[in-house]
Amino acid sequence: MGLRLRLVLLKGRNQRLEINRVVALLVDGGHFPLESRICEAIVDQEICWRDDERLPGIPVMWQGCLQKDVQHAIRSAAIQIQIVCPCPAPSPIFELKQLIIQKRTNLLSHPQGTFVRTVRQRMPVIGVVIVLPGLGPQYSRSRLNYCFSRQQPRARMALEEIDFLVFHYRLLARVVPCYSDAPPRFMC
């Protein structure tokens, strides 16, 4: 599609986990802990951002400084990327869909369909990554199992369209491939 985007997840001081298939990063980090390094998204123009330090000539996303800065970075890179992060760990993950819609962002305010489908309709997306804060892999897994339970069919429909789920616990990252025709699989 002529679009190259690489997501680099910080696993440790000198370790990185690269995902070459990513083209859209959905995060809204208003409640993400400042001490957690969310990720480093690198595109062809080497525009990237981190939540905890400033890099010369590169847009940096700080906690609570979301939409305008992100949209400016999108325009500067000429690549459609939107960052949106769910509520802190105590909040159920299935609230993510409504949280994004209520924010009425330019890319995610469509009232019909799930937020991932809306993004794919408006952006050249071949992959979607959701960054989920949590207390650890077991906690995140239990939250996801709850979302995929019978009691939350709408959340199940939304999560089934996500290509990767990234769990963060301090500097550790868990990448989970999800497919619409199969239950979610977890990388431990």
From Swiss-Prot:
Top-level taxon in the UniProt lineage: Eukaryota
Additional remark text: Partially overlaps YER152C.
Protein name from the UniProt record: Putative uncharacterized protein YER152W-A
